[in-house]
Amino acid sequence: MASTADGDMGETLEQMRGLWPGVEDLSLNKLATSLGASEQALRLIFSIFLGYPLALFYRHYLFYKDSYLIHLFHTFTGLSIAYFNFGHQFYHSLLCVVLQFLILRLMGRTVTAVITTLCFQMAYLLAGYYYTATGDYDIKWTMPHCVLTLKLIGLCIDYYDGGKDGNSLTSEQQKYAIRGVPSLLEVAGFSYFYGAFLVGPQFSMNHYMKLVRGQLTDIPGKMPNSTIPALKRLSLGLVYLVGYTLLSPHITDDYLLTEDYDNRPFWFRCMYMLIWGKFVLYKYVTCWLVTEGVCILSGLGFNGFDENGTVRWDACANMKVWLFETTPRFNGTIASFNINTNAWVARYIFKRLKFLGNKELSQGLSLLFLALWHGLHSGYLICFQMEFLIVIVEKQVSSLIRDSPALSSLASITALQPFYYLVQQTIHWLFMGYSMTAFCLFTWDKWLKVYRSIYFLGHVFFLSLLFILPYIHKAMVPRKEKLKKRE
């Protein structure tokens, strides 16, 4: 689902619709006022797009240069961006980076270091949420800090894995395990990389070090041929930005809280939530596509070659746009949206809970971690609780259709496929919007008001299916199919 700084990015793009008129005064404050945006929003937008000239500078002047120069460049530019956006509050990130380095050096590759890192970094982030919380989305230092928190926790776990015997690690853990001892400059460069400091994406220390060593290129010994792929992602991001800018005055979060919405027919309330639920995610899509382009341009997006020898630039992709736009399933949206954050949680939380012996419990705890990572508001918990419920029910429905001969035959009728797709998409985006209502409104008085207006439809629908589906499965799946499945 949506990523950390999601709300803050949303607030930024919400205010982008006024960015087109020209102004004469170049003062940021006056410029922002003229555009109908906040100064913080303007600073954030400028900082995200600043990644492109910085990536060009790196390509032409620092590629294959001494590693310490590259680390210094990333550290200086990242700290400058932090100061430009948050002033003296940039010290929060710097403090956590330095303390994390000390934890690695003083505690070494131990479980104690991992537990200390997890507790300290999450506690610092949650304390930041608590002391800066308001009833609305604000662009403040906690926005990039939640991205940094995952980076530093992942860094410590990979460092811990680097001290283990290779045979005791999975192939994935071997890929990310850090065998050497990172210096303070390396940790700082990794943390402050300009293309991902503010809004992500997540990437590992090993991948970052490949960038520094000049290994992330499709032409060994030369700069990566990544300008066109980067411009394609930038262009796609701008398409989403223009669409969002034009439509945002007409499809707003605030309308869900109005009396006019309450007084509309039930079908209208549901249809508005469906359309809004799809549209509200475009602000996140925009930011991630733009920052992905920065990562590709620098080379960080290089992901080797496919089986046909075609170069892949999706190492930092946070979106699978085609899948996101066409999938009729909730799992499809999860697989296509905020990819690197979801992969991080799967790698460092979900799979590490394997010892519990219960996949659903591990998944539930992973989603609880994600909810807390997003913030302390109740809406985040409700949103991820709905995701957990929906995914479980969707798996049960898929299993029922697959195992039932009657339903399987009905589902395979070609002439009915367009109808099935339309029904699936309607259910999919209606209840995606239902879940996003709590996420975007986030305080209990707001999301509760909207849920009451549609009679808690999402909870009633999926909780009913959760209890009814086992009986339907028992009635419609022949005994021999059940025995075959067990075998």
UniProtKB/Swiss-Prot annotation:
Reaction(s) catalysed (UniProt annotation): a 1-acyl-sn-glycero-3-phosphocholine + an acyl-CoA = a 1,2-diacyl-sn-glycero-3-phosphocholine + CoA; a 1-acyl-sn-glycero-3-phosphoethanolamine + an acyl-CoA = a 1,2-diacyl-sn-glycero-3-phosphoethanolamine + CoA; a 1-acyl-sn-glycero-3-phospho-L-serine + an acyl-CoA = a 1,2-diacyl-sn-glycero-3-phospho-L-serine + CoA; (9Z,12Z)-octadecadienoyl-CoA + a 1-acyl-sn-glycero-3-phosphocholine = 1-acyl-2-(9Z,12Z)-octadecadienoyl-sn-glycero-3-phosphocholine + CoA
Motif extent (Di-lysine motif): 484-487
Cellular compartment(s): Endoplasmic reticulum membrane
GO cellular component: endoplasmic reticulum membrane
Membrane topology, as annotated: Multi-pass membrane protein
GO process annotations (BP): chylomicron assembly; endoplasmic reticulum membrane organization; intestinal stem cell homeostasis; negative regulation of inflammatory response; negative regulation of response to endoplasmic reticulum stress; phosphatidylcholine acyl-chain remodeling; phosphatidylethanolamine acyl-chain remodeling; phosphatidylserine acyl-chain remodeling
Active site: N338, H374
Glycosylation sites: N225, N308, N331
Record's note on what induces expression: Up-regulated in response to liver X receptor/NR1H3 or NR1H2 agonist GW3965. Up-regulated in peritoneal macrophages upon exposure to 22(R)-hydroxycholesterol.
Residues found modified as N-acetylalanine: A2
InterPro entries found in the cross-reference section: LPLAT_7/PORCN-like (IPR049941), MBOAT_fam (IPR004299)
Transmembrane segments: 44-64, 84-104, 111-131, 180-200, 236-256, 285-305, 364-384, 422-442, 453-473
Domains (record comment): The di-lysine motif confers endoplasmic reticulum localization.
Function: Lysophospholipid O-acyltransferase (LPLAT) that catalyzes the reacylation step of the phospholipid remodeling process also known as the Lands cycle. Catalyzes transfer of the fatty acyl chain from fatty acyl-CoA to 1-acyl lysophospholipid to form various classes of phospholipids. Converts 1-acyl lysophosphatidylcholine (LPC) into phosphatidylcholine (PC) (LPCAT activity), 1-acyl lysophosphatidylserine (LPS) into phosphatidylserine (PS) (LPSAT activity) and 1-acyl lysophosphatidylethanolamine (LPE) into phosphatidylethanolamine (PE) (LPEAT activity).
Protein name: Lysophospholipid acyltransferase 5
Organism for this UniProt entry: Mus musculus (Mouse)
Taxonomy of the source species: Eukaryota, Metazoa, Chordata, Craniata, Vertebrata
The encoding gene: Lpcat3
